[in-house]
Amino acid sequence: RFKLVDSTEIFVDATHVKARANNRKMQKRIAKQEALFYADMLRQDINADREAHGKKPLKDKEDNNKPGSGGNDKFEDYTDDVPADEKTIKCSTTDPESGWFRKGEHKHVFAYGIETACDKNGWIIDFTVNPGNEHDSRTFKGLYDKLADIGMKYCIVDAGYKTPAIAKLLLDDGIKPVFPYKRPMTKDGFFRKSEYVYDEYNDAYICPGNHFLHYSTTNRDGYREYKSCGQICEKCEYLSQCTESKNHVKVVTRHVWEDYMETCEDIRHTEGMKELYSHRKETIERIFGTAKENHGFRYTQLYGKARMTMKVALTFACMNLKKLAKCKQEWGLRMT
């Protein structure tokens, strides 16, 4: 009636709520490989890219482990007798559906991740509840499926969501992702990846020493590998700033969906996008702050994901109703 909710600009972020679980009561469980939401699409694009470069398609991996999430396994799957070479995760015996979350530099707790979406006016649109050990970029698809038909034009997220898969997902659906700047994770004293220029015509990278890094292969993670000539690099004056490899070969990777990331960078540099991203602190961050300060959202007294979902739904519904009541009071409307 009053068109209070504007679904064209959606802000997405996640916060963590401490679970009702003792940090000392845990067991190790063998980590199981969880299928990514874009795995099949990526595999097809990888094989198509390899065939375009004259290479054979990759064979499927033999995986005996069934995909598993943060805490849906039975207690029979937990054991203290884990082989040393197996990758394990810590699982609470009190609340198995929670996840082991790194809260600070030296602090870990069992927690739940609450991924939330709101509009530019601070109205909470939807949410999902996940184990605290799952990364935001992996859980995004579950929330996005709930937001698919609301008329979203811009999706404003933080650096944790800045991945080629999410960029492709949004752009293919006609939604503009608004990502922040993410600094390069390069060692001090070494050239950044941006200093290696991609030559699209020759499908090669050009290093600061003005030499080519030619295509080598496309790996299972979806990255094309471009390698330099070790004999040329051995005599290069920039070798100490380029690579520490014993054979003096520099490897630069480029994702098969890197074009989507470049489109997102163009969007980031568009006029008005920086101001739009700055509204996160007034919208989604404000919601989390209010929930933690006024509604006991720092921790939960309930066990299990289902009860946690109930708590979050009730809290967010109350926050929306309180916001609506204040709006009506300001407008002088009767509460009917």
Task: Please name every model-derived segment.
Residues R1-T336:
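Anion-binding and metal-coordination hotspots
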